[in-house]
Amino acid sequence: MFGVAKRFWIPMVIVIVVAVAAVTVSRLHSVFGSHQHAPDTGNLDPIIAFYPKHVLYEVFGPPGTVASINYLDADAQPHEVVNAAVPWSFTIVTTLTAVVANVVARGDGASLGCRITVNEVNRPGMSGDSSSWKGWGHVRWFIEEVPAGAA
């Protein structure tokens, strides 16, 4: 009998430890994991309506310039306007919390410029022209505005 115990004492200890661990985990699950909490729908904070963002894309250049213009809409889907007369503009109005604004134009004139205006404010760094690239204009901007009092 002691010969069998000497030979199999390590596997017996492992079996006993695994059994004790299984019982302990089972009891802990029954104590801590048994409560079902229903969400309390009566205490929800009101949803804050975001003020609309008015995003204005503009492409400008010498009169008579014709341009191919690519821009992103409010859902960041690309659109193309081919052979548009310059000056060109397009307005997006959205209540999304964030908008990726991007406008790229390529024209046949000596210079071409692009501008993105948000809520009638043209911020620094939001316009570009083709002074270094003949006939190109490009502006990209990520717009995330939280109105005063909404935070």
Swiss-Prot record:
For this UniProt entry, which segments traverse the membrane?
A: 8-28, 81-101
The entry's localization annotation reads:
Cell membrane
- How does this protein sit in the membrane? Multi-pass membrane protein
Any Pfam family matching the protein: Mycobact_memb
* Keyword terms, alphabetized: Cell membrane, Membrane, Transmembrane, Transmembrane helix
* Source organism, top-level taxon: Bacteria
One GO cellular component assignment for this chain's record is: plasma membrane
Its family remark reads:
Belongs to the MmpS family.
Full protein name:
Probable transport accessory protein MmpS1
Q: From which lineage does this chain's organism come?
A: Bacteria, Bacillati, Actinomycetota, Actinomycetes, Mycobacteriales
Instruction: Supply the gene name.
Output: mmpS1
